[in-house]
């Protein structure tokens, strides 16, 4: 009987982590966890509980009522599916009140570790390969050149009909985001598999990763 493994994924913004590894998870029957959604779900809990976001103690106390899970690759808050709700503007408005709190960060890291016990999970997010899951069975750092990421974003904006779509502005935005992320600790773990998908179609990356997972599972 094959064993299910734990896969940790980090990488640069806009490199396609979600699209790539959500696809991998669906193809091999694993659960996909975007840890950033945990913070969004917790922000939603605080909103629904009418927490004063200027009161850190109230926010920390709310962690006792927070139960996050993933079922069929969809985020659930206290048993309720919240995939669309946590993308709404009020979440974006208030999330920065909760993410800097050390007690919230500590709670989330412990939860992120506990969720993947037993294997069968792909987890992506901040510090996943270096801090959260340093002993994951497979660690991957997904990267892509600034030019490739900007071109993809530009084409995506075109498809969505977004106005003021400027390639150079997108490039500068990506460069600034990279600088900020690396300043805040983004780095490739020494034993992580570096995949540069600048010139590789997403489906080819998906197939490469699935082959590696099957190898580690003992297939």
Swiss-Prot record:
Q: Which InterPro entries match?
A: Cytidylate_kin, Cytidylate_kinase_dom, P-loop_NTPase
GO biological process annotation, one example = pyrimidine nucleotide metabolic process
Per its record, the protein catalyses: CMP + ATP = CDP + ADP; dCMP + ATP = dCDP + ADP
Which Enzyme Commission number(s) are on file for it? 2.7.4.25
Q: Which SUPFAM superfamilies match?
A: P-loop containing nucleoside triphosphate hydrolases (SSF52540)
Q: Which Pfam families match?
A: Cytidylate_kin
Against HAMAP family, the record matches this protein to: Cytidyl_kinase_type1 (MF_00238)
Belongs to which family? Answer: Belongs to the cytidylate kinase family. Type 1 subfamily.
Protein name stated in the entry? Cytidylate kinase
Q: Which organism is it from?
A: Mesoplasma florum (strain ATCC 33453 / NBRC 100688 / NCTC 11704 / L1)
Q: What is the lineage of its organism?
A: Bacteria, Bacillati, Mycoplasmatota, Mollicutes, Entomoplasmatales
């Amino acid at each position: 009987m094959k064993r299910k493994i734990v896969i940790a994924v980090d990488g640069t913004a806009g490199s396609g982590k979600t699209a790539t590894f959500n696809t991998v998870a669906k193809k091999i029957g694993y659960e996909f966890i975007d840890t950033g959604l945990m913070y969004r779900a917790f922000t939603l809990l605080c909103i629904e509980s009418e927490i004063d976001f200027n009161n850190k103690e109230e926010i920390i106390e709310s962690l006792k009522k927070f139960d996050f899970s993933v079922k069929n690759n969809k985020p659930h808050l206290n048993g309720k599916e919240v995939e669309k709700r946590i993308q709404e503007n009020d979440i974006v408005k208030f999330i920065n009140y909760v993410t800097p709190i050390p007690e919230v960060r500590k709670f989330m890291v412990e939860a992120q570790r506990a969720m993947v016990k037993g294997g069968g999970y792909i987890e992506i997010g901040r510090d996943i390969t270096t801090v959260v899951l340093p002993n994951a069975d497979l660690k991957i750092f997904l990267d892509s050149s600034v030019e490739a990421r900007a071109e993809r974003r530009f084409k995506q904006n075109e498809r969505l009909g977004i106005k003021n779509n400027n390639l150079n502005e997108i490039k500068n935005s990506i460069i600034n985001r990279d600088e900020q992320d690396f300043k805040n600790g983004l780095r490739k773990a020494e034993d992580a598999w570096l995949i540069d998908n600048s010139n590789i179609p997403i489906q080819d990356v998906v197939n490469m990763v699935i082959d590696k997972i099957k190898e580690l599972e003992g297939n």
